[in-house]
Amino acid sequence: GWEKLISERMYQAYARNYGVDVRIARFQNTFGENGTFRGGREKSPAAICRKVAEATESIDVWGDGRQVRPFIYIDDLLDGIEALMQSDYQEPINLGTDDSITITELAEMIIDISGKNLKINYISGPTGEMRRNCDTARMKEVLKWEPTRPLRESFEKTYKWIEKYL
């Protein structure tokens, strides 16, 4: 929102006025091990991993499951940050992926990873925007970088980590 945009402008002004070397990265929907997975502050990948790990018959998903999101694994994001820090680029830049999946596809993938036979219940709740995309053209052009880790493999690691700590 506005607070992010104003912060970006403030960092750029600070760079101009004081000669500070600044990089501004706009992160996508990040997931991975060592993140929050309970308590109401977790994002959908961690919440779904936790729900699947705890479930015996079904999981609840807010909305109709058709919401589309691009997800980036934390290790890929860290590689992107490193590429940005090694560059001279000082304008805001999106760090993310062009690949998006629906929340239903995400839930089905996590259920498959778990080896369980679970049903998905769609319930009323906050769903956010139906589709969120991230334009990564500048990232690819300027940084000569893009995420490389397969989504399923990354979710396998995340699921196993969350399952271990439940």
Which ranges hold each PLM region?
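Short-chain dehydrogenase/reductase
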Residues: 1-8, 38-46, 70-71, 100
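Active-site Tyr-X1-5-Lys
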Residues: 1-26, 47-56
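Flexible, glycine-rich beta-alpha linker
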Residues: 23-44, 68
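Amphipathic alpha-helical recognition patches that constitute DNA-binding helices
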Residues: 26, 43, 47, 102, ...
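C-terminal substrate-binding subdomain of Rossmann-fold SDR/epimerase-dehydratase oxidoreductases
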Residues: 54-166
